[in-house]
């Protein structure tokens, strides 16, 4: 069985997040707020999972798929190699995981920031793998 490219898979998660918001998020153009926080939460979850997939491809923090890894393990591994990426991951955790996934903040600016950070992290991980 051919192993999947983790960066391509991470980008697929970002596409799924975009699709979840665009097709179901019901954006109010006047207020720039999504009307259904369920899809904001789903998009945040997809984005964060894609980011973790890209980070694991570079840093191999998660040794076993069945075990949970604390965010601090990722931050420690990233901080040893790339401070700029560490800043992206810290911000990404706050935006994608906490603000979007847990809090379901419906502001389009928050979601746009999540997509921008996810793409920046994945791009940086891809560069590190090259």
Description of each model-found segment:
Residues 1-130:
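Terminal alpha-helical segments
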């Amino acid at each position: 069985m051919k192993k999947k490219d983790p960066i391509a898979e991470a980008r697929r998660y970002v596409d799924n997040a975009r699709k979840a918001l665009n097709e179901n998020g019901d954006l109010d153009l006047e207020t720039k707020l999504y009307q259904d926080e369920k899809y904001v939460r789903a998009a945040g979850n997809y984005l964060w999972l894609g980011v973790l997939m890209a980070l694991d491809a570079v840093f191999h923090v998660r040794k076993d798929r069945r075990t949970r890894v604390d965010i601090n393990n990722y931050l420690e591994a990233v901080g040893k190699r790339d401070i700029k990426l560490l800043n992206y991951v810290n911000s990404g955790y706050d935006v994608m995981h906490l603000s979007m996934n847990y809090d379901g903040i419906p502001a389009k600016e928050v979601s746009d920031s999540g997509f921008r950070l996810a793409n920046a992290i994945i791009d940086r991980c891809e560069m590190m793998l090259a």
